[in-house]
């Protein structure tokens, strides 16, 4: 073998690692994961779910129940007669119900199962049994009477809660690949999804507004809030420690007033912002004025509006003089809204309003912090109105974060627990209203109440996962109620892994007509992949993270940062003035720490970055986001913003001063200078450089070979088609019961592949095969992207695939719950066809490997009530083989006889004419012909291509990457090496054509990849050199066997009489406008009539020649000795009316009406005339249209020729 040419200092080849992969497959590692990058890809999902039960405060769920607090009710009973007389305001005994602790158990079988060898339930069992993988949700209830006079505790089982795989509540957590295989899982099972009714469901990640950061917005809809409202506003999404959020908005009114808006239980409320300020702390108008205006006393625009703001409040609410009065006023107005307890004073209710609504991220004890932040927001609002700063772009990644699935799961669970407590109180209130004898101190009464309350919270969470619909009283501060979950489809591994890197903008934005939200903005560099997005209606809304982007799932420790900032010269925020043009506000996670000059702020930001990368300063986490916004003319509002919270997008870059890794976020990246390659670095300009340019691409986009040589839409198409490929969804297919699975039997590792291909272990799930491809117009069957396949290659397994289908047979569906079992698998003693035993065993179940066709029996059962043996038959028109038969026990785990089985079919799918194939460059096409080998062209070395494609596929698509892959694959096959196809490893000076051309020349082939070929039909040399190489091809799941529709007759629509649509309903194929135009353009009028009329809704209708109507014609009653005729009611006259019009002739004789002109309508009515009708052929839908228009008073008239 000749020596491979390698450029000095750059390795562009790799090993296939075939033996290493085989060894790892046979002997999975027992100590660690083989592919840690796969685990990192799903970490946001698992980490967010783990945070529910892990953390310094016992997890987010326990923080949530603390925020819920206690629910209170009074029984209205006096302690004794003296209390009733002396204290008329006595409410009775007080009952407080709260949740002390929440815990989620690992999935286990029921305790009553004595036959269970292993009580642990593993995911593979849930998949095969088509059940849900869930653990018990346990709530520790506290039943307190009269503020702790007597406390009762009880642990309640609130149903089975679906558990995320590989989370800390899953049995697979921390298992090695070897142990995973022992438990019937993939050796690298990544988890991150739920199993609901045997289906793998995933909570999709959503883009939401960045937390705890006030954002300036100009939105025309703000002006619709009321009179004098403008389109200016400041919006902040404030997030509690349990990850639930509350959005606060400041509205600017045209008269200078500012209104505070919030939403509570899907209702909006507006409060003057001065009222909120005066309720937060003891303050004066002077303090508010100084706090907002700062040093800008000479700014007349600001001072005039502040004066109007303060005077307007005093004029409207003259009776509110101090904080106590304001709190009481708020409490009085919101007592009913917040369902306050009767024993709470207005003052306490007002304080609760502030705690639950106003800037909740600052806590219940942060009134001063809330006061300062509101002043900052008001000042920013006035700057926006004055034009001093620009509005923030809510569609930019800088102002966005990710709503993780685990956090959303916890938010919904918290609300369901809150509803559970409300239902308990409602049940007690119902007993009180009915006058029942109740005793709060009686534990038996407590048990009776809890028995009558629906405790199955787990089923509600299972409903959310199975449907994706959010049933919420509050709306959870989200903009959509559906579309939260998707099926983690395992069509192939590319599609499966993409689900976990997918992020959606929200279904609300999908309905907008504007395209602003879909645009790819520069701020998303390195965080969202610019290539991996669908090309249809979700384009730009459904994105995928770059492969190096990760999401924070834990709160970084920022407790020491304030002291570090003070040591660097930040003035503490003891003075309540807002940042003017001369001062820079310093904030940490939405809390104002202090103030500093802008010059010093830049120095502090650079110093903090140096120290955090250096790693020698305690208290500075590496993932701290340091966003310094410098002052500018009408730019973003300046300040130094530090972030260390959850749900932030983060990515690694190299920090040049220390040559170490730095973690940056989207907010700070906008104001950083990051070079893409080391060659671009400029001294005193760039502070960072990318590790590699491919960090901006997603996992799938990185796998497209030489994508930098392709037109960008082709790379987008490949990201979509790679997920539609019939590949290898997994290895443990025998332990799955998916409704439909595709598997490529002849998958190969690509000769041309990127470095990340091996890092992510894609060879465990091959997605295609290497094919010898010739670019030649050879037969005429390759027009319009069609491709010709070598028939011998097809016979040797080229693209051979298999489809698996699973059918569940449940005899329990035929009886009600609790009824005795009357149907049993097997054969009875009655008479039944003995040929059934050819397919079925004596137990009534099919033999493994049995060939079944439509109508063949797949199982037999005996019905006691009918004393008869029945069978279930195979319904598909496509023959199959019985692959597996699984016996499924009852979900309640009660020991009883077999009632449910699942049968898996294996359906052969050899490539057929009409099946779709594609390369990895978006070059898709259907198989148009399987060409005999003897007629295929061949090269001088006797090689015949597997695939022939048309040269016209390249010029308009500009997929130069496919040319390069063909060269590289050919050279790699000749030298036995794997070629590196990572983007941007070549340039104009070092081209891939030279690099791979030299390899081909060393092997004795043409430098440019061309070869002389000989005609398979004549044996003569073709007059042109043919471009031949090795390209990795994919077989897509769009197969003709799943889509072809053929029918001569079949069901029709009862209204239009046209064939119904749908392959499953034996419907027809619609001949649309384009097909109609094509037939008209070709002048095939008879074919057009045949398709659109004769074979569709052909009907014969009677039309009146005189009035031109088809609706007024009617069949007459035939007379004796005559035939029935069709007459027109509109053009006829009643016989009685016709008699009155009789006239006499000149000679005095009467004129009689001819009997042939008289006809009856079948109801005894006689008519004269209206006989001028004829029969025409029309589409039935025309008659339907005529009747619909006539109902609206519109008449259609038809001209009939000849008259």
Curated annotation (Swiss-Prot):
A zinc finger (C4-type) spans 1104-1131. One of its GO terms (cellular component) is nucleus. It comes from the Eukaryota. One of its GO terms (biological process) is transcription elongation by RNA polymerase I. Coiled coil: none annotated. Changing residue 1107 to A: Lethal. Abolishes recruitment of RPA1 to Pol I. No effect. Changing residue 1127 to R: Responsible of suppression of RPA190-5 and RPA190-1 mutations. Its EC number is 2.7.7.6. CDD domains: RNA_pol_B_RPB2. One of its GO terms (molecular function) is DNA binding. Three distinct zinc-containing RNA polymerases are found in eukaryotic nuclei: polymerase I for the ribosomal RNA precursor, polymerase II for the mRNA precursor, and polymerase III for 5S and tRNA genes. Present with 14100 molecules/cell in log phase SD medium. Component of the RNA polymerase I (Pol I) complex consisting of 14 subunits: RPA135, RPA190, RPC40, RPA14, RPB5, RPO26, RPA43, RPB8, RPA12, RPB10, RPC19, RPC10, RPA49 and RPA34. The complex is composed of a horseshoe-shaped core containing ten subunits (RPA135, RPA190, RPB5, RPO26, RPB8, RPB10, RPC10, RPA12, RPC19 and RPC40) where RPA135 and RPA190 form the DNA-binding cleft. Outside of the core, RPA14 and RPA43 form the stalk that mediates interactions with transcription initiation factors and newly synthesized RNA. DNA-dependent RNA polymerases catalyze the transcription of DNA into RNA using the four ribonucleoside triphosphates as substrates. Component of RNA polymerase I (Pol I) which synthesizes ribosomal RNA precursors. Besides, RNA polymerase I has intrinsic RNA cleavage activity. RPA190 and RPA135 both contribute to the polymerase catalytic activity and together form the Pol I active center. In addition, subunit RPA12 contributes a catalytic zinc ribbon that is required for RNA cleavage by Pol I. Belongs to the RNA polymerase beta chain family. This is DNA-directed RNA polymerase I subunit RPA135.
């Amino acid at each position: 073998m000749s020596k491979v040419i390698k450029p000095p200092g750059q390795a562009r080849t790799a090993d296939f690692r075939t033996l290493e992969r085989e060894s790892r497959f046979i002997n999975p590692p027992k100590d660690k994961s083989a592919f840690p990058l796969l685990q990192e890809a799903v970490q946001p999902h698992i980490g967010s779910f783990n945070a529910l039960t892990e953390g310094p405060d016992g997890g987010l769920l326990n923080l949530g129940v603390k925020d819920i607090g206690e629910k209170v009710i009074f029984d209205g009973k006096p302690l004794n007669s003296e209390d009733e007389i002396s204290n008329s305001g006595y409410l009775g005994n007080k009952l407080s119900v709260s949740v002390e602790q929440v815990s989620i158990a690992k999935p286990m079988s029921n305790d009553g199962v004595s036959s269970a060898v292993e009580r642990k339930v593993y995911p593979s069992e849930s998949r095969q049994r088509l059940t849900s993988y869930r653990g018990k949700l346990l709530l520790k209830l506290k039943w307190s009477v009269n503020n702790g006079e007597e406390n009762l505790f009880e642990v309640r089982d609130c149903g089975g809660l679906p558990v995320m795989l590989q989370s800390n509540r899953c049995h697979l957590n921390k298992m090695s690949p070897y142990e995973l295989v022992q438990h019937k899982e993939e050796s690298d099972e990544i988890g991150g999804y739920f199993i609901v009714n045997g289906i793998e469901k995933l909570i999709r990640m959503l883009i939401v507004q960045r937390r705890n950061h006030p954002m300036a917005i100009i939105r025309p809809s703000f002006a619709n809030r009321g009179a004098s409202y403008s389109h200016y506003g400041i919006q902040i999404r404030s997030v509690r420690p349990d990850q639930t959020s509350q959005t606060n908005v400041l509205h600017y009114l045209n008269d200078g007033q500012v209104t505070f808006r919030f939403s509570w239980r899907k209702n909006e409320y507006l409060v003057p912002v001065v009222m909120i300020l005066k309720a937060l702390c003891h303050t004066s108008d002077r303090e508010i004025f100084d706090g907002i205006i700062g040093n800008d006393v000479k700014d007349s625009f600001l001072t005039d509006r502040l004066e109007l703001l303060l005077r307007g409040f005093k004029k409207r609410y003259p009776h509110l003089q101090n904080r106590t009065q304001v709190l009481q006023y708020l409490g009085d107005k919101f007592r009913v809204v917040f369902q306050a307890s009767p024993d709470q004073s207005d003052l306490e209710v007002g304080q609760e309003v502030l705690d639950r609504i106003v800037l909740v991220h600052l806590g219940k004890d942060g009134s001063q912090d809330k006061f300062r932040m509101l002043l900052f927001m008001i000042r920013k609002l006035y700057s926006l109105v004055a034009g001093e700063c620009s509005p923030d772009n809510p569609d930019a990644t800088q102002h966005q974060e990710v709503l993780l699935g685990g956090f959303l799961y916890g938010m919904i669970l918290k609300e369901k627990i809150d509803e559970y407590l409300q239902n308990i109180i409602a049940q007690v209130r119902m007993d009180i209203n009915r006058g029942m004898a109740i005793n709060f101190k009686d534990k038996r009464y407590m048990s009776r109440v809890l028995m009558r309350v629906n405790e199955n919270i787990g089923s509600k969470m299972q409903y959310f996962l199975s449907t994706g619909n959010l049933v919420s009283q509050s709306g959870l501060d989200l903009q959509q109620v559906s579309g939260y979950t998707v099926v983690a489809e395992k069509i192939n591994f590319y599609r499966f892994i993409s689900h976990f890197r997918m992020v959606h903008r929200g279904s609300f934005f999908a309905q907008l007509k504007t395209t602003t939200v879909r645009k790819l903005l520069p701020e998303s560099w390195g965080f969202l992949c610019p290539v991996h997005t669908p090309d249809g209606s979700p384009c730009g809304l459904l994105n995928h993270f770059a492969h190096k982007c990760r999401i924070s799932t834990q709160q970084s420790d920022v407790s020491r940062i304030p002291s570090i900032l003070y040591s660097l010269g930040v003035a503490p925020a003891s003075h309540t003035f807002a940042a003017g043009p001369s001062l820079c506000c310093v904030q940490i996670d939405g809390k104002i720490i202090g103030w500093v000059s802008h010059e010093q702020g830049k120095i502090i930001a650079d110093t903090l970055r140096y120290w955090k990368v250096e790693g020698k300063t305690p208290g500075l986490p590496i993932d701290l986001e340091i966003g310094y916004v410098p002052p500018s003319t009408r730019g973003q509002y300046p300040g130094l913003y530090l972030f260390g919270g959850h749900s932030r997008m983060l990515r690694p870059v190299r920090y040049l001063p220390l040559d170490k890794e730095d973690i940056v976020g989207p907010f700070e990246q906008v104001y950083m200078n990051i070079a893409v390659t080391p060659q671009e670095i400029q001294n005193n300009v760039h502070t960072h450089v990318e590790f590699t340019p491919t960090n901006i691409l997603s996992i799938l986009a990185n796998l497209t070979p030489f994508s930098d040589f392709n037109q960008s839409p082709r790379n987008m198409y490949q990201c979509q088609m790679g997920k539609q490929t019939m590949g290898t969804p997994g290895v443990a297919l025998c332990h799955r019961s998916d409704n439909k699975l595709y598997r490529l039997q002849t998958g190969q590792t690509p000769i041309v592949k990127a470095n990340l291909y091996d890092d992510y272990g894609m060879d465990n799930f091959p997605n295609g095969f290497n094919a010898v491809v010739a670019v030649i117009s050879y037969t005429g069957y390759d027009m319009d992207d069609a491709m010709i396949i070598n028939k011998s290659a097809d016979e040797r397994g080229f693209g051979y695939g298999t489809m698996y289908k699973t059918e569940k047979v449940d005899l329990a569906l035929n009886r009600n719950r609790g009824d005795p079992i009357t149907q049993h698998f097997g054969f009875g003693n009655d008479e039944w066809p003995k040929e059934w035993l050819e397919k079925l065993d004596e137990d009534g179940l099919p033999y493994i490997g049995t060939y079944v066709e439509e109508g063949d029996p797949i199982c037999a059962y005996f019905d006691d009530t009918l004393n008869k043996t029945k069978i279930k038959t195979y319904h598909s028109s496509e023959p199959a083989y019985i692959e597996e038969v699984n016996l499924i026990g009852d979900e309640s785990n009660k020991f009883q006889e077999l009632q449910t089985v699942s049968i898996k079919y294996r359906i052969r799918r050899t490539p057929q004419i009409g099946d779709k194939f594609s390369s990895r460059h978006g070059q898709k096409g259907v198989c148009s012909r399987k060409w005999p080998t003897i007629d295929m062209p061949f090269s001088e070395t006797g090689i015949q291509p597997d695939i022939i494609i048309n040269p016209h596929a390249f010029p308009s698509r500009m997929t130069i990457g496919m040319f390069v892959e063909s060269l590289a694959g050919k050279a790699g096959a000749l030298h036995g090496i794997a070629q590196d196809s990572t983007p941007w490893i070549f340039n104009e000076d070092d081209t891939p054509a030279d690099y791979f051309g030299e390899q081909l020349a060393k092997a004795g082939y043409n430098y440019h990849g061309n070869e002389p070929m000989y005609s398979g039909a004549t044996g003569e040399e073709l007059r042109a050199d043919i471009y031949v190489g090795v390209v990795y091809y994919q077989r897509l799941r769009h197969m003709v066997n799943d889509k072809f529709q053929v029918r001569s007759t079949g069901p029709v629509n009862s209204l239009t009489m046209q064939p119904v649509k749908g392959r499953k309903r034996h419907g027809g194929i619609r001949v649309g406008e384009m097909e109609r135009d094509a037939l008209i353009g070709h002048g095939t009028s008879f074919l057009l009539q045949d398709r659109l009329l004769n074979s569709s809704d052909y009907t014969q209708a009677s039309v009146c020649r005189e009035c031109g109507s088809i609706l007024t014609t009617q069949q007459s009653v035939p007379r004796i000795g005559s035939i029935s005729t069709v007459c027109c009611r509109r053009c006829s006259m009643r016989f009685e009316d016709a008699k009155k019009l009789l006239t006499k002739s000149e000679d005095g004789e009467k004129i009689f009406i001819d009997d042939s002109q008289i006809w009856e309508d079948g109801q005894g009515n006689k008519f004269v005339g209206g006989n001028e009708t004829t029969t025409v052929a029309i589409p039935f839908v025309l008659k339907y249209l005529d009747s619909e228009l006539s109902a609206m008073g519109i008449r259609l008239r038809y001209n009939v020729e000849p008259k």
